[in-house]
Structures are given as structure tokens and as C-alpha cells.
Amino acid sequence: MFINARATHKEETIHPLPKEQTNFVFIGYDSREDIAYRVCENSLARHSSRPLTIIDLNVNHLRSSGHFTREWREDNEGQKYDVLDDKPFSTEFSHTRFLCPHLAKINNMKNWIMFCDCDFLFLRDIDKLFKFVEENHADKAVACVKFDWQPTKDTKMDNQKQLGYDKKLWSSLMLFNMKHKDVKNLSSDDVNT
């Protein structure tokens, strides 16, 4: 069973939840990468052995529903900058990825949830990853791959500025433990301010 939850993310259930245990995956959505999003979504669904709910993090929906209010500006070359810290960023979901725990909480998701960038291609059942973190990291708030990587070029996709910083790529795929007290306490204010 696969449910695509393209939703407005209002403070109500995104969709009627299946009675069986469901894996919840939030995928970052960027309007310039719609095809990549659809490939990622399809590859997740194709290999899933358990019910799977995929939720797109569409910044327009998140803004219109009041969940994402953080402002950004764009220069003449199309480079986006965060208004709060004036740092450049490249995708529409650079900040909204951190809304996943808030959106999960208001939609009564109580187990592990996953976020991934839209350019992922899944070749195996994602349920194995969910089971792995449930069995081996139940005491952790977040699970991710701790890459030790620094960029070698100054630009990346769509000629956006490439920055090097600690923990680069760590947030490309994250699993949040909705049972952990620190994750439960996250709110949209933590992302927007």
C-alpha cells in the first residue's frame, strides 16, 4: 500500500492513516527538480514491503498553511539567500527539511520518520533502514550518515554557490525518532526564527 500525501500540511491529519504500521517519508521538493522528486518517490514505492506514506515538502504549501515563514531573497543570478543569516542556499527545501518533526507531531506520527533530498534513488526496501534504527538506535533523536566531505568546486546545481562547512550533507537523509523527548519538543518556531 502506497499513499502519496501531496498536502497542504494543515494542522490536521495529512491523510487517513492506514491501520497497519506505516513508514513515513518526507521528500524535499524543489520546483526545478520535479522529475527528480518523482523518480525518488517512485523508487521508494517500488521497493517498499510495508505501507509507505510519502509527503512532499513543498515550500508553497508550507508557506500558505503557515508552517514555514522564514524569509529568503533571490539575487539577479537566481541565487537564494536566507534573510536571517544572509547565507546562500540552493534548494527550496534547504530549511523546510527541519520541519519534518513538527509536521509529524501535528499529524500524530509517533515512530521514526525519514527525510531525504529529492535526488535520491532507492534500490532496496527502505523498511530495512527503519528497522535498523528502531533496533539499534532507539535512544537517539536523529540518525544520519556522518559524511566527511568538503566540496572541490565553488558552484553546484543550477550554478548555485557551493559552501563548505562542518557536517556537509549530513541532513541529506535523516531519520527522526518521534518518541525522543528532544524531537517531540521541536516546533516550527525552531525553523522559522
Describe these PLM feature segments.
Residues 2-193:
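Glycosyltransferase catalytic domains, chiefly GT-A lineage
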